[in-house]
Amino acid sequence: MELENITENLSPIKIILQDIHSDNRVSLTLDKNVLCEKCPFFSKMFKGFKEQFEKIVVVKVPYVDITSKILKNFHGYKMEISDDWKSQIKLYMCYDYLGIKTDFPTKIKVQDYCFDELLDLIELNGYNEQTVKTLVGNLPVDNLEKLPIDFLTVMDQELVDFDIIAIDNNGVVSEVDCTMNTLKKIYEQSDCNFHVQYFEKTQKLMVLSSDNVSTGYNQNTIHTYEYNYKNDNYELKDKQPMTGKKYNHRIGGDRLEEEQQIIGKICFMKCNPEEDKLAFVIFNDGQNKIVTYDLDKKIYREVIRRNHITEICYSSNNKTVHIEKNNSVNSIYYNGILLFSENNILRYICHVNNDVIVFNEHCVNQKLNFVKTTRIPYYGSDIFRPIKNDSFGFNDDKIIYGTENSITDIKYKSDHIFIVSAKTIVVYSIFQSSVIKEICCGATNIKFIDRDRVIAYGINCPTNIYNISTGEKIKNIDYPNIKQLFILNNVKNYALKQRIKAILNSHTLKKLI
């Protein structure tokens, strides 16, 4: 078929398309300049190979009927392609063959009896992250053993056995499918004046919003979300003002007051890792208050502090740790007892076991200190001594890790302290008293997935999964710019991944035998 309006001054060339899957052929008269401008495949052909001097060129392509429509579309012709799944995949394969970037149609759905045909079609293009997503979304789980080992190997690498709840810098809370890289919006508040907490045991999500009402005070509202397995999303189950009965300390014993609203701006909020309990700093009537709140019983305690509170932590033994600033002096308090004071800025407190606090001093050099909390540290034996030369180490008095770069996050797991500095994860072993690994992650924060894996994220940072043992990047999650996140168990994907691993292990064992 010849196109209209092709003249000599437009460098006409006859292209014969030969289908690589069949004997189909299509002849087109096209413009060489247009092909060079629109298509990388022909741009290379006409600028570096003998075809640049030919008047007739035979080109082998997938699916000549679709490829011919793409080439004609370059010349102004309308391209009409069916929206059925086969045509959409073939369209992608033709674009890919011509060197034109486009996304694989990962959202297509096929009937179970069509899966083998889908698999055959995708095998022609090869396995990658996008094609595996499509197969995972259409997988008939009862026939895993019949699938190609090459596909199962790639699928094992791409399938993620967890999802995340992510809070971005624009005030949007979303559930992110880490395998399919899709998201569902749960909550949004443009002023970002809210706090989020996920409770793993009950699988409940809590959003605590703080709104400035006409009285001039901040009214706090608790939004409770529960997972709906039928609809496969988080649904709002309850929304009400934050209220509770306050413990009033009196001689002769505590007394519960009448239930009342908790008013004031919430500055920091942390969750007890084992129970549905919160610790937060609230500012009201010019006072800083530390509040511990039982979500289940709706009972709270509050302690008024004279100084500005810059950070708070809730330990696993139901004790609070917080940092206060008074002029240039920063102090750490453990359950209300002063542990340590410095003229430097203190940040990033967290618990190591039940009796050690980790914190960061922000000065000329960033330092990481460990302070015992089993006894009030009035004596040298209760505080560790500084170690020189930018290193960790146990000594008589204190442990310090020094770095010229800013420390942006600190986490603890088993024997290890994980410090994120200069977008690098520094792994420090308490037992070995030394740094045992450094992993360049390009992020400012980390969250543990399990013993061997972390997810690295941050504002203006990519989101990646890393194997802490090997330092290897396992997978990129296509959802950057995360302010805060929580890990969700994906039971379906976990079970599927275990079945795939069992099949792969069985295949390896048979090869050895």
From Swiss-Prot:
Q: Which family does it belong to?
A: Belongs to the mimivirus BTB/WD family.
Which residues does the UniProt record annotate as the domain BTB? 11-83
Superkingdom of origin organism: Viruses
Q: What name does the UniProt record give this protein? A: Putative BTB/POZ domain-containing protein L55
Q: Which SUPFAM superfamilies match?
A: WD40 repeat-like
